[in-house]
From Swiss-Prot:
<dbReference type="GO" id="GO:0005886">
    <property type="term" value="C:plasma membrane"/>
</dbReference>
<keyword id="KW-0812">Transmembrane</keyword>
<comment type="pathway">
    <text>One-carbon metabolism; methanogenesis from CO(2); methyl-coenzyme M from 5,10-methylene-5,6,7,8-tetrahydromethanopterin: step 2/2.</text>
</comment>
<keyword id="KW-1003">Cell membrane</keyword>
<feature type="transmembrane region" description="Helical">
    <location>
        <begin position="62"/>
        <end position="82"/>
    </location>
</feature>
<keyword id="KW-0489">Methyltransferase</keyword>
<dbReference type="GO" id="GO:0032259">
    <property type="term" value="P:methylation"/>
</dbReference>
<feature type="transmembrane region" description="Helical">
    <location>
        <begin position="152"/>
        <end position="172"/>
    </location>
</feature>
<keyword id="KW-0554">One-carbon metabolism</keyword>
<feature type="transmembrane region" description="Helical">
    <location>
        <begin position="84"/>
        <end position="104"/>
    </location>
</feature>
<feature type="transmembrane region" description="Helical">
    <location>
        <begin position="18"/>
        <end position="38"/>
    </location>
</feature>
<keyword id="KW-1278">Translocase</keyword>
<comment type="similarity">
    <text>Belongs to the MtrC family.</text>
</comment>
<feature type="transmembrane region" description="Helical">
    <location>
        <begin position="222"/>
        <end position="242"/>
    </location>
</feature>
<feature type="transmembrane region" description="Helical">
    <location>
        <begin position="180"/>
        <end position="200"/>
    </location>
</feature>
<keyword id="KW-0472">Membrane</keyword>
<feature type="transmembrane region" description="Helical">
    <location>
        <begin position="39"/>
        <end position="59"/>
    </location>
</feature>
Amino acid sequence: MSHGGGGHAAELFPENQVLVIGAVLSLIGMYIAHFVPSLAMLLGGLLAAGACVAGANTTRRVAAYGLGTGVPSIGMVSLGMGTISALAGVLIPSVLAGSVALPFDLVLATPIIAAVVAIIVGFIVGKLTQNPVGMKVPIIVSSMTKLSLMGALAILGFCTAFAGGFSADLIINGAINNGIIALAFIAAGMSILHPFNACIGPNESHKRTITLATACGLMAWLVFSIAKLDIVSILVAAVFWIYTYGSFVSMSLADACEVKYVPELPKKE
């Protein structure tokens, strides 16, 4: 049943479980991309899609409280918070390395630092939406925190996959100066906001929404693979996306009470 008429079906997968899986997969993907650059796009890009799926799942839950047109907006807020946090995670180690003597390479903690900053930023933004903004959604603080985290992991995950690592020099030259971070913002943002926005309604199904979220995450990976001109990743991502999106279409046709196909447009009035 929906909260506030938002069109939210019963949960098949616990939100926190999806969140943990998405976060762990994206973190693993970033470390693979950093230590094995030859597999950066193939595995790093694939696993970055996990953050998109988890973010889309959280969007589904918070949007069920009747956000209406706020469904796309909250996705953009997620990536706004995520971008700030990802950049902070990349730059903080390089700044501290020049001023503080540490017994280990702080660069290796970049994804973790980005995640911590994202949680803090999301919590603050969530509190601000309660006061002074005045939103009455009871889970808004926790949801903003989770969306900020998933936004940061998605942004940093795809940028790391493209750049071949998450050190400041690699990200700045391989993802920021060339504008790839803007592509990450749009691709990951659409993957997080679109699934529930497309499936919302009285017949919304958690399984169908998650399937579309997976397809959107895989499409983001495909877009990055094409931008990188990584042939193997392009082929694998295309196969995965076609299969997943085909599954979503099949579910939609099966769940629909009636399917009407658009006829051929008349050649004359």
